[in-house]
């Protein structure tokens, strides 16, 4: 069995205003830095063998807090990077709703059919994270693996782990500095904890529903 701990990065400077980040690279907010420390404190109780992170700053800095508490290195992994939002990158949700109303509707209602103009499709994200998870299963059997990623690849990972269609993409909560625990067993994957945020206390902020 692999014990998989999926982590969403702590709050970035753009999260509170509802700005699509994609492959752009804002820093953690001051609240996000506090969230990352609280998350690291929470996970310090676990035995951890390896930590993977998306190479973007908001994920890597979150992963570093976890790694330093356990004296581990962080392995940067391109396959778990955020979706390329293309033309939406850097735009506020309200701006996207006004400029691309039909595309926004499709993203909220039919995400499995979306390919961002100048960017990436959800199917592409699914394929890359599924390949990564298959490699984790083979390489880290009988280990505990932390994966620090973003909302879109994490929701795609949940779909891959449970064998459900990408149309169910929005069915999984994914707040900043949350973590989930999944047992990757021989015949099935079992979600034991999903979107845990109780360690954040007063620094918890509910994620925007359309990002």
From Swiss-Prot:
Site description Important for activity, residues in chain: 58
Example GO BP: L-serine biosynthetic process
Record key words, sorted: Amino-acid biosynthesis, Hydrolase, Serine biosynthesis
SUPFAM superfamilies xrefs: Phosphoglycerate mutase-like
Domain of life: Bacteria
A molecular-function term among this protein's GO annotations: L-phosphoserine phosphatase activity
EC number: 3.1.3.3
Substrates-to-products reaction catalysed: O-phospho-L-serine + H2O = L-serine + phosphate; O-phospho-D-serine + H2O = D-serine + phosphate
Function noted in UniProt: Catalyzes the dephosphorylation of L-phosphoserine to serine and inorganic phosphate. Is poorly or not active toward D-phosphoserine, DL-phosphothreonine, 3-phosphoglycerate, para-nitrophenylphosphate, and fructose-6-phosphate. Does not display phosphoglycerate mutase activity.
Record's protein name: Phosphoserine phosphatase 1
Organism: Hydrogenobacter thermophilus (strain DSM 6534 / IAM 12695 / TK-6)
Upper lineage: Bacteria, Pseudomonadati, Aquificota, Aquificia, Aquificales
Gene this protein is translated from: pspA
């Amino acid at each position: 069995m692999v014990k998989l701990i999926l982590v969403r990065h702590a709050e970035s400077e753009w999260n509170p205003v509802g700005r699509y980040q994609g492959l752009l690279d804002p820093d953690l907010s001051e609240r996000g830095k506090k969230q990352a420390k609280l998350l690291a404190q929470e996970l310090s109780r676990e035995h951890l063998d390896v930590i993977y992170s998306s190479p973007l700053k908001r994920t890597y800095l979150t992963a570093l807090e976890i790694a330093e508490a356990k004296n581990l290195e962080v392995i940067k992994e391109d396959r778990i990077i955020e979706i390329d939002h293309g033309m939406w990158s850097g735009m506020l949700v309200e701006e996207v709703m006004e400029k691309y109303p039909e595309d926004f509707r499709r993203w909220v209602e039919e995400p499995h059919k979306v390919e961002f103009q100048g960017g990436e499709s959800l199917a592409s994200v699914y394929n890359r994270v599924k390949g990564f998870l298959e490699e984790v299963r083979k390489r880290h059997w009988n280990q505990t693996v932390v994966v620090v990623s973003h909302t879109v690849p994490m929701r795609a990972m949940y779909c891959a782990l449970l064998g459900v269609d990408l149309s169910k993409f929005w069915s999984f909560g994914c707040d900043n500095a949350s973590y989930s625990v999944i047992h990757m067993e021989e015949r099935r994957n079992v979600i034991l904890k999903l979107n845990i945020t109780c360690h954040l206390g007063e620094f918890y902020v509910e994620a925007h529903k359309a990002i």
